[in-house]
Every structure is written in C-alpha cells, then in structure tokens.
Swiss-Prot record:
Gene giving rise to this polypeptide: queC
Species lineage: Bacteria, Pseudomonadati, Pseudomonadota, Gammaproteobacteria, Enterobacterales
Originating organism: Escherichia coli (strain 55989 / EAEC)
Protein name: 7-cyano-7-deazaguanine synthase
Record-level Gene Ontology MF annotations: ATP binding; ligase activity, forming carbon-nitrogen bonds; zinc ion binding
Cofactor: Zn(2+)
InterPro entries recorded: QueC, Rossmann-like_a/b/a_fold
Gene Ontology annotations of biological process type: queuosine biosynthetic process
C-alpha cells in the first residue's frame, strides 16, 4: 500500500497537494501545525478540508515553542502584516525562521511511524515569496539529512516547486477542485477564508494567479501539464 503524509495548512497550495495526493496514493495522512500563528483559523479550515476530502488521518501538532523563538509578523500581533513584499533585504517580515525545517522534520517522523514513503509539501520556488526555506536546494538537503538520520528513505515531494500560481490553479482545476480551493481554503495572512483580505502578499499572489488562469485557461493548463507531466 502506498502511503503519504501531506504537510497541510488548509491553504491553496497544500490543499491542491492534498487533492493530487489522494489520486496518487492509497492512504494519505495530513499533519497540521499549531505554532501560535496570527492566522490560526487555518487550523480549523485544515481539519474540515482534510475530513471533507477523505484523508485517512488528520493530526494537529502543537509546536508553539516555535512562536517563542521565531519573531515574525505571523507570530507577533505587534508586527503588522505588510501589504506588499519583499522588504529591502529580500526576506519579508512574514518569514518564520526555521518553520519548514521543523515542519518537514516532524512530518518525516510521522511518516516513519505510519510507514509512509513520502512527505508532500506545497513549497514553490517559481512564485518565490523570498522565503529561503521554500527553495528546492533546501528541501533536497533536508531530505537527505532526515533520511540519513532515520536510516530510512522517506521522499520529500514538492509538486508545486516549478509551477507558478496560475498553474497551481490549473492543477486544482485539473482535478475538478477549483471552486473548493477558491472558496474553502485559507491562504490570507490575516486569517480570512476564501478570497481573503485582498491586501496582504499572500492574497495578492493568489488573486493575481487566479486572474491569470481565468483569463487564459487553455494556455495555462497546457503549461501546467507540460511541467508536471500530467496528460
């Protein structure tokens, strides 16, 4: 039996990854992280979506220690979420240092326990938000270290790594879940479901990608299929 663990926030990217994983694996487990995030409404959204879509298990892990260590506008109410990013040094204040290091490592431990062969994450370098822990070289390096440390070949999969936001919408549409992803996910840094606040960088990226896709569906769908190998 093929099993996978999806790092699942209930946002556009991870929901699209979950939709695809459910088509490719016999058993899919979701793991969601509570790190005291500003937009912690995503935890309830993730629970609801994982249940609705049919994930085998829906685990929420308490990693609020990260909140104490990582200072970010997503972990501190006193730091405002900016409308546009990145900042002058290239790293936006929404970056949570160490977040994906922790999430992927814990997801791999969970995968080890449930005998899953893959950990799936929705990080992406094409519409790169300036987060160093979304880069392909980082994911590959951590994957190698984790596999060595557990003496087990757990594969980190990044199905969105080389497609842009418009193509991510196309991928959701390919699986017949465009409306679900648009209306029922939570991507907004300010914790607003669906189309979100319309001002933060996450909402900007999401809306621009959707508008691009809706304006030229055939071209974007063809590009997505070419990059992902789907037919």
């Amino acid at each position: 039996m093929k099993r996978a663990v999806v790092v699942f926030s209930g946002g556009q990217d991870s929901t699209t990854c979950l939709v695809q994983a459910l088509q490719q694996y016999d058993e899919v487990h979701c793991v969601t992280f509570d790190y005291g995030q500003r937009h912690r409404a995503e935890i309830d959204v993730a629970r609801e979506l994982a249940l609705k879509l049919g994930a085998r298990a829906r685990k929420v892990l308490d990693v609020t220690l990260l909140n104490e260590l990582a200072v970010s506008s997503l972990t501190r109410d006193s730091i405002p979420v900016p409308d546009y990013e990145p900042e002058a040094d290239g790293i936006p204040n929404t970056f949570v240092p160490g977040r994906n290091i922790l999430f992927l490592t814990l997801a791999a431990i969970y995968a080890y326990q449930v005998k899953a062969e893959a950990v799936i994450t929705g990080v992406c370098e094409t519409d790169f938000s300036g987060y160093p822990d979304c880069r392909d070289e980082f994911v590959k390096a951590l994957n190698h270290a984790v596999s060595l440390g557990m003496a087990k070949d757990i594969r980190f999969e990044t199905p969105l790594m080389w497609i842009d936001k418009a193509e991510t919408w196309a991928l959701a549409d390919y699986y017949g879940k465009l409306d679900l992803v648009r209306n029922e996910t939570l991507t907004c840094y300010n914790g607003i479901k669906g189309d979100g606040c319309g001002h933060c960088a996450a909402c900007n990226l999401r809306a621009n990608g959707l508008n691009h896709y809706l304006a030229d569906k055939p071209t974007v769908m063809a590009a997505m299929k070419q990059k992902t190998g789907l037919r």
